[in-house]
Amino acid sequence: MTDHSNTRVVVGMSGGVDSSVVALLLKQQGYDVVGVFMKNWDDTDENGVCTATEDYKDVAKVADKIGIPYYSINFEKEYWDRVFTYFLDEYKKGRTPNPDVICNKEIKFKAFLDYAMDLGADYIATGHYARLQHDEDGTMHLLRGVDSNKDQTYFLSQLDSKTLQKVMFPLGEMVKPDVRKLALNAGLATAKKKDSVGICFIGEKNFKEFLGHYLPATPGKMMTFDGQVKGEHAGLMYYTIGQRRGLGIGGDGEDNEPWFVVGKDLKKNILYVGKGYHNPHLYATHLKASDLHFVTDEDLGNDFHVTAKFRYRQKDSGVTVHFNDDHTEVTVTFDDPVRAITPGQAVVFYNGEECLGSGMIDAAYNDERVLQYV
């Protein structure tokens, strides 16, 4: 058996079951394990309880149980500067950002990685469901997690091979029920803790209320593309393309079909709505994306056919990717039209099991027509 006792792994511990089991597994495998809790947001829930304090208590219980040292590090300034200002800027532009992708790139795998290296780490480890594979020359490839329901490569798609050389994903070969079982058998305090949902590090806040603290809402007209006014919207930032809930207009007429958000006009402050899940205004034939990041330096050529996801947990779609002349932008053409392409979200590229990288969606098109989504 390999002796890992001289290999230090710093585990990003959130107070959840996944990162708890990561620390447990690495400790069982004989690594020199250190737990670190990242506090990235000054947070209290609606009952006035600081959720970060509660999570840190869980980290302490787990670390004490498995016998590892643990620390807390405050990244609030880095999070504000690198993630949250980006998040607000995107909403101001009428887009729907994905802060988790940026949070991983800038905080968990940059600020935290740097901090861990200062602690003498050889590697960092997190509770992400993803796998790594390395070539003989050290190039790292990012692969989907075995648990297809939990695979998190979508959120890791802006990391590069050099960063991943210093990373471990011990849960990549596991499925969630087995992770919980391990935690229960080991008597970990987090074994039955529910998974967190919501924005990276901000948790389960009322999103509308939360966003309203930082950006003034400007109500405006809610109307159809042919000019029928259907009501008033609360502020364009609260709506995303394809959304059904929260519009306050029920189905009407004989068909009684529900209404959906089918467009936005930031300049005129209009929210466009249309009837039917398959409303033609919701379908795009291609998109343009920029802010491109690929995991490896492999030359993919100017055109390549792969699959892509346009949001987390969506089924892959076949696409052809075409680079512009200076490789700063791609046009992604879909094998079949895709519903509710959303500017600000990530388009993530896959070749089979491998996550190749991603870009941020700037605009969606139906043939030559740009869709009015911002």
Curated annotation (Swiss-Prot):
Q: A GO BP term, please?
A: tRNA wobble position uridine thiolation
Q: Return the annotated region ranges for Interaction with tRNA.
A: 150-152, 311-312
Q: Where is this site: Interaction with tRNA?
A: H128, Q345
UniProt superkingdom: Bacteria
Q: Per UniProt, which keywords does this protein have? A: ATP-binding, Cytoplasm, Disulfide bond, Nucleotide-binding, RNA-binding, Transferase, tRNA processing, tRNA-binding
According to its UniProt record, this protein's enzyme class is: transferase
The reply on keyword Cell division is: no
Q: Record's Pfam families?
A: tRNA_Me_trans, tRNA_Me_trans_C, tRNA_Me_trans_M
Q: Where in the cell is it found?
A: Cytoplasm
Question: Which InterPro entries has this protein been placed in?
Answer: MnmA-like (IPR004506), MnmA-like_C (IPR046885), MnmA-like_central (IPR046884), MnmA-like_central_sf (IPR023382), Rossmann-like_a/b/a_fold (IPR014729)
Renumbered residue ranges of the record's region Interaction with target base in tRNA: 98-100
Q: Which residues form the active site?
A: C103 (nucleophile), C200 (cysteine persulfide intermediate)
Q: Which reaction(s) does its UniProt entry say it catalyses? A: S-sulfanyl-L-cysteinyl-[protein] + uridine(34) in tRNA + AH2 + ATP = 2-thiouridine(34) in tRNA + L-cysteinyl-[protein] + A + AMP + diphosphate + H(+)
Q: What is its EC number?
A: 2.8.1.13
SS bonds (residue pairs):
C103-C200
Q: Which of this chain's residues are annotated to bind ATP?
A: G12, M13, S14, G15, G16, V17, D18, S19, M38, G127
Gene Ontology MF terms in the entry: ATP binding; tRNA binding; tRNA-uridine 2-sulfurtransferase activity
Give the transmembrane region(s).
none
Query: What does the protein in this record do?
Result: Catalyzes the 2-thiolation of uridine at the wobble position (U34) of tRNA, leading to the formation of s(2)U34.
Q: What is this protein called?
A: tRNA-specific 2-thiouridylase MnmA
Q: Which organism is it from?
A: Lactiplantibacillus plantarum (strain ATCC BAA-793 / NCIMB 8826 / WCFS1)
Gene name, per UniProt, is: mnmA
